[in-house]
Amino acid sequence: MDPVKNCSFTGNHLGIQPHSFVEIVEMLADDCETITGIRPKTPFNEKGHEILFITPSGDVFADPGIYTFMGYLMLFHELDLDYTFSTYASEGGNFGSFTTFNMAKKLNAKMYAEAERLGAKWILGGECGHMWRVINQYMATYNGPAPSCMMDVPTSPITGTKFTNAAATKMVHITEFTADLIKHNKLNLDPSRNDHIITTFHDSCNPARGMGLLEEPRYVLKAVCNNFVEMPENTIREQTFCCGAGSGLNTEEIMELRMRSGMPRGNALRYVQEKYGVNHMACVCAIDRATLPPLADYWAPGVTVSGVHELVANALVMKGECKRTMDLRQEDLPNVTAEAEEE
């Protein structure tokens, strides 16, 4: 119950105070500058922006989610996106959905309340699982309709695309937004920067079965990675397997149970690792980014886990960036290593 209490009182499940939230994001912006030579802007609680961005707090406080968050910062800076963060609605995940209807409704209400307070026209949401189950299936009846006096049907300021699927909730998933950018050739991408990985994609239960978000993440991954491999068809999309540790089961005390319950996903991952040399698995869920690394270490040692937008930022060629020699984890890029060997 502590995560639920923390979300209610301080805005995120870890109970991190607003000033600490700001400091952590600023630190991640510093890391972006180390890698690219460009320090992305980090607007907090600013009124009058078109977009309010809300993401799971695991992307701010936990490895490997922090690299996904750095990807957001770099993408938004490159687009010069008119957006703001909120330190009060600083948790996209709805931990109330694990407890009671009333608590889930209360936590979800903060999204609209902050959008109204800050004057945002629509909300862009980060990579999360149960966050999007609640938004897609329940938000319109929990706390809708959205404040129609000031919120619009989400429209990309970059491409002009109207996200009519979000007309009721006024919220768009980040992979929908990025897939639209790529479709309209609005990003300068160099997928060779991800040539050190052969990646597959884990369909997180809530976005896949609870939302139908199946094609957009794959469209993005194929644009930013030259080496993408699907796991067997009866283990992905609507037939995906659970990570084995969602719904509050991500604790060290039940690690054996987690490894057993995650075995179907681990088995599918090991299959593509042995057959195709897969060494990376992307996903669009913060809980998965926390639970899948130990599962991969156990069932398919050598496979790393990341969010989709970490790989987007690796491939993103930013205007005015320095010569990129490192990926977001500050590890050498493959093309840089090859150039050094040639010299």
Regions found by a protein language model. Give the residues of each.
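A short, acidic, amphipathic alpha-helical segment used as a generic capping/interface helix at domain edges
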Residues: L257-N279, A290
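Redox- and metal-dependent alpha/beta enzyme cores, enriched for Fe-S-associated oxidoreductases
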Residues: L73-S86, K183-L187, H196-L257
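A polyampholytic, Gly/Pro-enriched intrinsically disordered region
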Residues: A104-L107, K186-F201, G248-S261, K323-E343
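Iron-sulfur-cluster electron-transfer modules
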Residues: M1-S156, G160, R329-E343
